[in-house]
From Swiss-Prot:
Residues 21-71 form the BPTI/Kunitz inhibitor domain. InterPro entries: Kunitz_BPTI, Kunitz_BPTI_sf, Prtase_inh_Kunz-CS, TFPI/VKTCI-like. One of its GO terms (molecular function) is potassium channel regulator activity. The keyword Transmembrane helix does not apply. The record marks 31-32 as: Reactive bond. Keywords: Disulfide bond, Ion channel impairing toxin, Nematocyst, Potassium channel impairing toxin, Protease inhibitor, Secreted, Serine protease inhibitor, Signal, Toxin, Voltage-gated potassium channel impairing toxin. This is U-actitoxin-Avd3o. Belongs to the venom Kunitz-type family. Sea anemone type 2 potassium channel toxin subfamily. It comes from Anemonia viridis.
Amino acid sequence: MVYLLCFFLVADVSYGINKDCLLPKVVGFCRARFPRYYYNSSSRRCEKFNYGGCGGNANNFSSYYECHIKCFGPRAIIFPEDSPKEN
């Protein structure tokens, strides 16, 4: 029974993620430093990075909020204490 519960929990977490969010972080080949966010599938969190401005992929969001909505869906958002403040 415990095995089945674990299976369903893992299946639910991985099934609900948007496929774009599973792409790796790509900084790009240009030299700008635009603050952006990506979904880190290892930590299962949206994290900040500096985007170069060209190249890249769909796992690249202009805000923590946008990343969270795209990768977790329209659920309640809990901002971690160390999350960057949006201005």
